Amino acid sequence: VRQVGIIGLGKMGYNLALNMIDNDILVFGYDKFINKDLIENSKLVVLTKLQDLVTSLARPRVIWMMVPSGETTENLIDELGRMLSPNDIIIDGGNSRYTDTIRRYKYLKEFDISLVDCGTSGGVNGARYGASLMVGGDLEVVKSISWLFESLAIKDGYAYIGESGSGHFVKMVHNGIEYGMMQAIGEGFDLLEHSHYELNYKDVARVWANGSIIQGLLMDVTLSALSKDEKLTSIAGRIDDSGEGQWTIEEALKLKVSIPVIAASLFARYKSRDDLLFSEKIVASMRNEFGGHKVYKKK
């Protein structure tokens, strides 16, 4: 029986684990914070110590990390580097910055441990029933565990991208594209909202989600949200970002590549958090000064 250890049993990690179990893989799971209600209903073998996960797996070990990028991933790589044996394989399925991935790959190489980067898309549903996987790392290493990626991916949803970091690089660009597409959908509905027509947004989204050129997962989730609350009255229009959009833009600046749509979509997210509206106040005051245009006073 093939075995995989999975570290990080949040929404994505837990659903990937269930996907593995459906594919007859024996899965050992570890997380610092375990949701017992979720875990008790599955065939997942849950361990409370990282060392126990490592010792439970047959060698060469395959460990899939599904944890937040940055410091959490960094610390985990350090710990695993000390615990694992030569020829073991770590898969980073999170949204790590590709430059960090290359550095970690080189660090683990000193211990003859392989790091494979796997850009993972498709959300929670994809993790559970078939994900989109962009994989980077040494070709021979990736070939040796291609059975795992093929098991977890939707049909035609897995590709070996290239050398270390390339999987995370392609996922970063994917997320940048996602920002731009989401912003365009948001702006379209904003225009509908300001029109003189009394529109049923759920009907609009349903039609757009079925057979139109702009159909797809993002329109499907828009329809799902509007079906619950057509005017989104319960939601504040504040949008967070998880870093990949910024990394995409930084890469474009470095390579001198023009990506105005992705850049504008990230800046729109920043603006959504701006309660001061200071730039708007500056522009309004300039118009007032040079042209006597009206300014609106605070009530």
Spans of features found by a protein language model:
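Conserved dinucleotide-binding and phosphotransfer motif residues
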Residues: 23, 111, 255
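NAD(P)+-binding Rossmann beta1-loop-alpha1 motif at the extreme N-terminus of oxidoreductases
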Residues: 1-61, 87, 124-127, 288
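Rossmann-like NAD(P)-binding element
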Residues: 33, 44-102, 127-135
